C-alpha cells in the first residue's frame, strides 16, 4: 500500500504507529508503536516519538527532540532543536514509574526554543513562547513569554512571535500582523481571530524578520 506520508530510508516506523497524511519524517527518526502523529507535520533528523505520545497537525519538530510517553502536543506547535521533555519528576534507575508517567500538555501554537527543557506535569498555554535554553517548571499562561533558569514570565508574545507592548487600556497590537490583543487579569486574548483555528492564509507568511521590528522599537524609544 502506498504511504500517505513521507519517510526517509533511515527512519524506523514501528507497526501500530499512527501517522497523518503529508507528514514528513527525516533521517534516523523513530516513531514507536502506539505513537500518534497528525497530518502535515515535519520531524527533523533524529526525532523520537514514544508510545502514548500524541502530536497534532502541522507540528514542526526540529532535530534531536524526543517526545516521550505522557506528552501531548496540540496543533501548530514548533519544537526547536534539542529541546527536552521529561515524564518523571524524580527518576531513579532502580525504581520503575512507567505506569505513573506525569503528563505534559503543549497547547496550540506554542513555540519551544532550542535547548529548552520542559519539566513534566505542566501545561504550556496557547501560543506560549519558551526562549532558547529556558528551563520551564510551572504552567505558562496563553501567549506567555518565558526566559531563563528557572523559567520566568517576561511578558507576552503575539501569534507572530513578537513581544506585546500593552498600553494603559491593556491593549496591544502585533507590529507584523496588526492583530489586536487584550490583557485581562492574568490572561491575554486576541481580539481579531478565533484562537482555536489556524491563521488565515493572508497572515501565514512572515513579512519581515524579528530583528528589524526590534530595531524599530528601539528607534521609537
Name each model feature, range by range:
Residues 1-10, 22, 71, 76, ...:
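Terminal amphipathic alpha-helical/low-complexity segments used for targeting or macromolecular assembly
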Residues 2-9, 14-17, 24-123, 150, ...:
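Flexible, glycine/small-residue-enriched loop-and-beta-strand segment within the central core
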Residues 114, 132-133:
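Active-site-proximal glycine-rich helix-loop-beta segment
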Residues 138-139:
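Loop-to-transmembrane alpha-helix entry segments
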Amino acid at each position: 500500500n502506498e504511504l500517505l506520508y513521507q519517510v526517509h530510508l533511515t527512519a524506523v516506523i514501528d507497526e501500530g504507529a499512527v501517522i497523518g497524511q503529508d507528514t514528513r519524517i527525516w533521517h534516523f527518526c523513530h516513531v514507536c508503536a502506539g505513537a500518534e502523529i497528525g497530518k502535515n507535520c515535519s520531524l527533523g533528523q533524529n526525532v523520537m516519538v514514544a508510545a502514548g505520545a500524541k502530536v497534532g497537525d502541522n507540528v514542526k519538530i526540529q532535530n534531536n527532540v524526543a517526545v516521550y510517553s505522557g506528552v501531548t502536543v496540540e496543533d501548530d506547535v514548533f519544537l526547536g532543536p534539542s529541546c527536552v521533555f521529561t515524564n518523571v519528576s524524580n527518576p531513579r534507575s532502580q525504581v520503575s514509574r512507567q505506569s505513573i508517567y506525569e503528563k505534559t500538555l503543549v497547547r496550540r501554537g506554542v513555540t519551544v526554543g532550542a535547548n529548552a527543557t520542559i519539566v513534566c506535569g505542566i501545561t504550556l498555554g496557547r501560543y506560549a513562547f519558551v526562549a532558547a535554553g529556558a528551563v520551564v517548571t510551572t504552567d505558562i499562561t496563553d501567549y506567555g513569554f518565558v526566559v531563563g533558569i528557572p523559567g520566568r514570565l517576561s511578558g507576552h508574545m503575539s501569534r507572530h512571535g513578537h513581544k506585546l507592548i500593552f498600553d494603559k487600556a491593556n491593549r496591544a497590537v502585533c507590529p507584523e500582523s496588526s492583530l489586536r490583543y487584550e490583557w485581562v487579569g492574568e490572561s491575554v486574548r486576541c481580539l481579531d481571530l478565533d484562537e482555536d483555528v489556524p491563521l488565515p492564509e493572508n497572515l501565514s507568511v512572515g513579512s519581515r524578520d524579528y530583528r528589524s521590528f526590534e530595531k524599530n522599537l528601539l528607534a521609537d524609544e
